[in-house]
Amino acid sequence: MLAASASTQQLHNHIEYEIADIELAEFGRKELAIAEKEMPGLMALREKYHKEKPLKGARIAGSLHMTIQTAVLIETLVALGAQVRWASCNIFSTQDHAAAAIASSGIPVFAKKGETLDEYWAYTHRILEWGDQETPNMILDDGGDATGLVILGSKAEQDLSVLERPNNEEEIALYSSIRNKLSDDPSFYSRIKSSIQGVTEETTTGVARLYQMQANGSLPFPAINVNDSVTKSKFDNLYGCRESLVDGIKRATDVMVAGKIALVIGYGDVGKGSAQSLRGLGATVMIAEIDPICALQASMEGYRVVRLNDVVQNVDIFVTATGNFNVITHDHLIRMKDEAIVCNIGHFDNEIDVASLKPYQWENIKPQVDHITLPSGNKIILLAEGRLVNLGCATGHPSFVMSNSFTNQVLAQIELFTQGSNYDNQVYILPKHLDELVARLHLDKIGANLTELTEEQAAYINVPIKGPYKSEQYRY
């Protein structure tokens, strides 16, 4: 096996990594230098806490897209005292030069673009394997896979029947990886679970899993819902998608978006940003929604709200953004027009019924771009095999908006690691004053100057002069 392939390597101090090519480290380091200038929130936290090192003693198992922006996050956590092991949370989202830069700096990382499902779960296990009888004590998650692996594995220690009847290829790989681990170490997962002080979750889908566990009483440690910080969901989800969706579509297909008919399925924050993205390049955009409030919002913004089933034969570009499954079904797929582009910007790959297309003829155009011939003779263009198009076919959100999200992540990790005993096994949101702090840290970079309240004005509206300025119930 070549040294540059994804084989386990040893660096100084016996740091291990599995990446595509360590020779990409210099390229990654150059892009990291640019990203740091665009991520003022993270750099401000480094400056504030680098001497205090509030994360000293934290052993963080990180499962989040291994991009250049994530590399800045990782190095911020390390600068604040943490030990880190990292894997990507998506088989296509890794930027190999970013992984190489992190590996070359001595941080264990297990990620490469285009992982198999077996590799994906093997790498997720690697972030939990600390050696020398040590275990992680914190999880930083995106989509809930690392958290879910620990919890499902703990259940399987007691009852292997939970690993029966997988529903898809991903579950086949997941269940197999758990069985293999249990054969080597029958109490592995329960040891990990008992050592975790808290988890911070990045995205909508992972947060939904946490709330589900909280509701049924199975959440084994405190969690902070980073996604619903205003400076995450209203920025990363909205403005990030507004730029990265069309970036992915254009890099993958080179098509002219102007004049096309596009359908965005789901009009939450991600859907809103996606719709703006397509409209901004001149597409006629329609929205499909189940929620009457979101549907009304879309209508008031000038989008036509439709049912997928009624328009499927007329749409040029399909984008799913729901967090649900089987949104675009086989029946929808086989009715699509010739050269329709089909993609997803939700976290998981099950919004589009890609499995139902397997019997048909596939022609790979380039990585993450497939031409599929339907029974009608029409061909559709499937992007990133139905996984995140902006990370599979492009490089994800810009650094500046990710600085908002990742500053929240660092603050959440500090809070749970240093104050974990104050939290029950429930899901929490960072308080308003920290949300406002994250925003403040990013204003200078874009030349924004805040107006200041007078004492009389502050008293009149009954808020502190320095904030927070809105109630917890306020909807931005």
Curated annotation (Swiss-Prot):
NCBIfam families: ahcY, PRK05476.2-3
EC number(s) per entry: 3.13.2.1
This protein's encoding gene: ahcY
Annotated catalysed reactions: S-adenosyl-L-homocysteine + H2O = L-homocysteine + adenosine
UniProt cross-references to Pfam families, sorted A to Z: AdoHcyase, AdoHcyase_NAD
Cellular compartment(s): Cytoplasm
Known pathway: Amino-acid biosynthesis; L-homocysteine biosynthesis; L-homocysteine from S-adenosyl-L-homocysteine: step 1/1
Role: May play a key role in the regulation of the intracellular concentration of adenosylhomocysteine.
Chief location: cytoplasm
GO biological process, alphabetically ordered: L-homocysteine biosynthetic process; one-carbon metabolic process; S-adenosylmethionine cycle
Residues reported in the UniProt entry to bind substrate: T67, D142, E202, K232, D236
Family: Belongs to the adenosylhomocysteinase family.
Keywords in alphabetical order: Cytoplasm, Hydrolase, NAD, One-carbon metabolism
Keyword Signal attributed: no
Gene Ontology MF annotations: adenosylhomocysteinase activity
Protein name as it appears in the record: Adenosylhomocysteinase
Binding-site residues for NAD(+), renumbered to this chain: 203-205, 237, 266-271, 289, 324, 345-347, 390
Entry-linked PROSITE patterns: ADOHCYASE_1, ADOHCYASE_2
Cofactor binding note from Swiss-Prot or TrEMBL: Binds 1 NAD(+) per subunit.
